[in-house]
C-alpha cells in the first residue's frame, strides 16, 4: 500500500510541474548606465525575470543599436536591442559603413519598441533663398547643399545615406556638385545650423529630442515632406511608416508623413525555443509595465510586434509560436 501511495504522490507531483518549466541564465547586452538604451533594457529585464527559471544579467557592452547585432552573432550576449532596419541590414550582408559584418544567426523576439522617425530639415533661410522645399527637387537640380549629419556608424548617418540613396545619390555625388557633407555630434549639428554654416540635416530621432527641440525654438527651420515614392522606397530598405504629429517641433503646424526604424529585441537562432517563447510571452503580457518605465516603450503593440516591418530579421521560432497561438501578426 505504501508503495502505491508513494507512486500516486510522485505522479501528482509531476503533474503540477509546469509544462513550460525553463532554466536559463541569460546576459543582456546594452549601452552604458544613464542612456535610453539602458532604461529600456532594465524594463525588459524586469518583465523577463517574472518567468520562473529565467535570470537576466545586464552587460554594458553595446556600442549602440546599429552594431548591437554583432553581440549576438559573436556570442557576447544572449539578448540585445537593435533597430529593425539595422537588424535587416546586418542579417543580409552586414553594414559596411558601420563596420558591421554579416550576422546570419540573429533572430528577433519582438519589434516596435518606440516611435522614432527619419527627420529631414532645411533651414528656413535656405528655402527662402532657393525656393527648394523638397529633397527630390534638390537632387533634380543637383544643388550644392551644405549637409550636416551624425557621425559614421550612427542610425542618423545611415538614415541620411538611405534618404539620398533611394534617390540614386551618394554623399560623394553631393560633394561633386560643390556641396558639403559634414559628420559630427548632435550639439555641433545644432550650433552649425543655428549659425547658418549648414543648410540641411537628416537624423533618426524621437519627438522631444533635446538638440532638435532647442534648434527649432532658436532658429527658423523648415520641415521637409518626402514624396510618397521616396517613402515607399525607404520602406523597402527596412523602414516603416510613421506620422509626426503637428507641433512636434516649434513652427511645425502640419503633420509630416515619414518612416522610422523602431527598436527590437534580438537573440541567437540557437536560443532554446521554449526560453524564447517565454521571453516573448512575458514581454507581451507585461506591456503596461514596459510603458510605465519609458514613454517610448508605450508604443509597443504585441498584436504587430512580430510583423516583418518591425522585426527586421527573421523571427525566432519560439517567438513565432507565441504570436501564432495568440492570433497576432507575424512573418
Residue ranges and their predicted role:
Residues 4-21:
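Sec-dependent N-terminal signal peptides of Gram-positive bacterial secreted proteins and lipoproteins
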Residues 23, 53, 63-64, 74, ...:
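Extracytoplasmic
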Residues 25-51, 56-59, 116-195, 308-318:
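Bilobed "Venus flytrap"/periplasmic-binding protein-like clamshell domains
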Residues 64-117:
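N-terminal segment of the mature folded domain
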Amino acid at each position: 500500500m505504501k508503495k502505491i501511495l508513494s507512486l500516486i504522490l510522485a505522479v501528482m507531483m509531476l503533474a503540477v510541474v509546469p509544462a513550460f518549466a525553463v532554466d536559463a541564465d541569460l546576459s543582456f547586452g546594452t549601452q552604458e548606465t544613464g542612456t535610453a538604451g539602458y532604461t529600456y533594457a532594465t524594463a525588459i529585464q524586469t518583465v523577463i525575470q517574472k518567468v520562473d527559471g529565467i535570470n537576466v544579467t545586464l552587460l554594458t557592452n553595446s556600442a549602440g543599436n546599429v552594431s548591437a547585432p554583432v553581440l549576438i552573432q559573436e556570442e557576447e550576449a544572449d539578448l540585445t536591442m537593435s533597430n529593425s532596419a539595422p537588424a535587416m541590414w546586418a542579417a543580409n550582408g552586414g553594414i559596411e559603413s558601420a563596420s558591421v559584418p554579416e550576422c546570419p544567426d540573429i533572430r528577433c523576439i519582438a519589434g516596435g519598441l518606440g516611435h522614432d522617425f527619419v527627420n529631414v530639415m532645411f533651414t528656413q533661410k535656405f528655402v527662402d533663398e532657393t525656393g527648394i522645399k523638397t529633397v527630390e527637387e534638390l537632387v533634380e537640380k543637383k544643388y550644392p547643399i551644405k549637409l550636416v549629419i551624425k557621425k559614421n556608424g550612427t542610425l542618423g548617418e545611415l538614415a541620411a545615406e538611405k534618404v539620398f540613396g533611394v534617390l540614386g545619390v551618394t554623399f560623394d555625388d553631393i560633394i561633386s556638385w560643390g556641396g558639403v557633407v559634414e559628420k559630427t555630434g548632435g550639439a555641433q549639428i545644432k550650433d552649425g545650423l543655428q549659425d547658418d554654416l549648414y543648410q540641411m540635416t537628416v537624423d533618426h530621432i524621437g519627438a522631444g529630442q533635446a538638440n532638435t527641440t532647442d534648434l527649432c525654438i532658436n532658429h527658423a527651420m523648415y520641415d521637409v515632406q518626402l514624396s510618397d515614392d521616396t517613402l515607399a522606397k525607404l520602406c523597402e530598405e527596412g523602414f516603416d511608416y510613421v506620422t509626426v504629429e503637428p507641433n512636434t517641433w516649434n513652427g511645425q503646424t502640419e503633420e509630416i508623413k515619414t518612416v522610422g526604424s523602431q527598436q527590437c529585441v534580438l537573440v541567437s537562432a540557437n536560443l532554446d525555443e521554449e526560453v524564447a517563447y517565454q521571453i516573448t510571452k512575458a514581454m507581451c503580457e507585461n506591456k503596461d509595465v514596459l510603458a510605465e518605465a519609458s514613454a517610448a516603450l508605450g508604443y509597443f503593440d504585441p498584436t504587430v510586434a512580430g510583423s516583418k516591418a518591425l522585426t527586421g530579421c527573421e523571427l525566432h521560432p519560439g517567438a513565432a509560436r507565441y504570436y501564432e497561438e495568440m492570433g497576432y501578426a507575424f512573418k
